[in-house]
Amino acid sequence: MMETQFPWLTTIVLLPLLAALLIPFIPDQNGKTMRWYGLGVGAIDFALMCYVFWKYYNASDSGFQLVEKYLWLPQIGLSWAVSVDGLSMPLVLLAGLVTTLSIFAAWQVDYKPRLFYFLMLVLYSAQIGVFVAQDLMLLFIMWELELVPVYLLISIWGGKKRRYAATKFLLYTAAASIFILVAALGMALYGEGNTTFDMVELGLKDYPLAFELLLYLGLLITFGVKLAVFPLHTWLPDAHGEASAPVSMILAGVLLKMGGYGLIRLNLEMLSDAHVYFAPVLAILGVVNIVYGGLNSFGQSNMKRRLAYSSVAHMGFVLLGIASFTDLGISGALLQMISHGLIAAVLFFLAGVTYDRLHTLALDEMGGLGQVMPKIFALFTISAMASLALPGMSGFASELMVFVGVTSSDIYSSTFCTVTVFLAAVGLILTPIYLLSMLRQMFYSTGKAPVCLLKNTPYENEVLDEAICFGTNCVLPAKAVYTDAKPREVAIAACFLVLIIGIGLYPKIATRMYDAKIVAVNTQVRQSYTFAKADPQLFAKGFLFPRIPESEVLSVSGLLR
């Protein structure tokens, strides 16, 4: 572990939260001060992350770095313990970038701007807190803290069915998160010695297999809900369909990744013995997500719901990579999380930009937009190409790594690998179908002209006024001219697309941050398999074929046991 004297991570986590508490005392009449304040806080925090990781993070070290630990409630073993490693550091940067740009995207918020930016900054802190928490109870607290601002952001600034969507999101995620609390208490209280929630110490305990399997199942439900794993995904299309564009950017770009992070951090790394038996289940769920998400996406006429089901499909590759038992597959899963975070964020942002002009998300009411909005057309097309894994884009690199990782796995039988890869490839073929179909409906076909009728509007006779709409607060002239993307909107999209193309052309930009950690985690998982392969239990015998040479597995049993 690498420790520093100055509490950098604590500062990064608490800065947005403390800044949010000052919002009620800042004078602001028209909301302009609030938006600059929110953007400034987000940008400063993101810049601080970049500085700290550039100066202090060692990519070749697989252990925890920048460790800070302060006793909070010593009577029950609870402490403020934060750190980063290869699993969390890239996701912290992703959360900082997406949240900062989502604040910049919410430039037109004029309804309760103080509350809006307060919630966005609280959400900022909670997200970072989840990724850097080294104390399992602290992770649970941050996980729960994140639910409140998301619920309010959807229910106040969402669409017509915003309360239904927000309530459904809250019920799903809050109910599932109980398993984190149960697992934390169970792991902390197991065995002799002092009670602790420190993840490092909990990971070193030797749990009975039955107990570990129960823990794994409970956490799989928790993280499966957040990752939108079938059949726990139904909250996602409703939430995206009703949330405003900046909130959808965070939902797809960051919150889904919390589920994938939890699976790797807790299920894969800390409960590796149980992972041996659940890995085939994850692989099957991954294939189901890919095919089911693709088929449902094609059937959606609402643009944001189509993108939401696309996210369900892409998260299937994360499950496949985690289940692969290979360095390449797990690395591809993490790269897929980073890649999808960038791609989904820019797609939902552009969906919001389009909605601002048309005041509709119905694809059959669009058409011919390519001529009147060429910049939006170009940005949308590039983003869609990235989502369908065009070579040279980050999605291609991550999905290829997952495919090769699963194919080259020496744990599964050749039949299981072949069927899994074939079905995933079938699902992959669906991606260009529903994305190119969406582009055709939006930018090429004639469609039906959007009808915008607002009574008592002062703009009825003004032809050149721009159509503006954010959430439930619309100023939409009846004869509005639908303008192309503004410089601010182009800049936001460009920030994402530069990274998407950069990672696609040179994936090492991202993978070098976590390669060492992935090797260490997978070595531990494969070692757990060697303990289990002599006596395959439960359903694993039908899927696993023991063919790991003993010489390939490092002897780390002393560290594990």
Curated annotation (Swiss-Prot):
As its record notes, the protein acts as a catalyst of: a plastoquinone + NADH + (n+1) H(+)(in) = a plastoquinol + NAD(+) + n H(+)(out); a plastoquinone + NADPH + (n+1) H(+)(in) = a plastoquinol + NADP(+) + n H(+)(out)
Q: Which Pfam families match?
A: Proton_antipo_M
| Entry's EC annotation | 7.1.1.-
Q: Which InterPro entries match?
A: NADH_Q_OxRdtase_chain4 (IPR022997), NADH_Q_OxRdtase_chainM/4 (IPR010227), NADH_UbQ_OxRdtase (IPR003918), ND/Mrp_TM (IPR001750)
Compartment(s) where it occurs, according to its Swiss-Prot or TrEMBL record: Cellular thylakoid membrane
Q: What class of enzyme is it?
A: translocase
Example GO biological process term?
electron transport coupled proton transport
User: What UniProt keywords are attached to this protein's entry?
Assistant: Membrane, NAD, NADP, Plastoquinone, Quinone, Thylakoid, Translocase, Transmembrane, Transmembrane helix
List GO molecular-function terms, semicolon-separated: NADH dehydrogenase (ubiquinone) activity; ubiquinone binding
Where is it predominantly found? membrane
- Cellular component per GO? plasma membrane-derived thylakoid membrane
- How does the entry describe its membrane topology? Multi-pass membrane protein
Show the stretches that span the lipid bilayer: 6-26, 36-56, 87-107, 115-135, 136-156, 169-189, 210-230, 244-264, 275-295, 312-332, 333-353, 376-396, 419-439, 490-510
Function statement:
NDH-1 shuttles electrons from NAD(P)H, via FMN and iron-sulfur (Fe-S) centers, to quinones in the respiratory chain. The immediate electron acceptor for the enzyme in this species is believed to be plastoquinone. Couples the redox reaction to proton translocation (for every two electrons transferred, four hydrogen ions are translocated across the cytoplasmic membrane), and thus conserves the redox energy in a proton gradient.
Give the matching PANTHER family: NAD(P)H-QUINONE OXIDOREDUCTASE CHAIN 4, CHLOROPLASTIC (PTHR43507:SF21), NADH-UBIQUINONE OXIDOREDUCTASE CHAIN 4 (PTHR43507)
Family in the record: Belongs to the complex I subunit 4 family.
Q: What is this protein called?
A: NAD(P)H-quinone oxidoreductase chain 4 2
Q: Which organism is it from?
A: Trichodesmium erythraeum (strain IMS101)
